[in-house]
Amino acid sequence: MIRKWETKEIGPLLALWLESTIHAHPFIKEAYWHESVAVVRDVYLPAASTWVWEEDDEIKGFISVLESRFVGALFVAPTALRRGIGRALVDEVKRHYAWLSLEVYQKNLQAVNFYHAQGFRIEDCAWQDDTLQPTWIMRWPVDQTPLT
C-alpha cells in the first residue's frame, strides 16, 4: 500500500535508505553513506514530500520529491526488489506532478535502465564532487513540443 510518510517513521525510513543506498552504489565508499545520514535526516527528508510502500506494517520502499519536482530519492529494500514497488512509487508521484527530474549515478545502470522504462530521458550530465562520480540528469516527460 502506498501512503504519505509520517515523520514519526524517521528511524525505519533512514535504515531502509542506508541499506538500499549502500546496496545500489557499490562503487561509492560505504563510509560516505554513513556520513550522509544526518543530512538526509535533518535536511532532505524534512524538505521533501515523501510516499512509502508499506507491507505487513513495514516500509519496503519510498520516494521523496524535493522542490516540487526533483526526485531526491527512490529506494526499495534489497529483499523487495523486482516486485513492482519502485514502478508503483514513480507512478504515484507522476499523478501529483506535471513533470519530474532526477539525478542518477552513471554507473548505476540498473537505476538508469529503470528510469528509462518509466519514461525518463537523459537531458544532461553532471559531476558529484562529494563522491567523485559522474551523474545523469533525467526528466519526465520528455519534451512533447511538436516540430513545425
Regions found by a protein language model. Give the residues of each.
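Conserved beta-hairpin
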Residues: A48-G61, L66
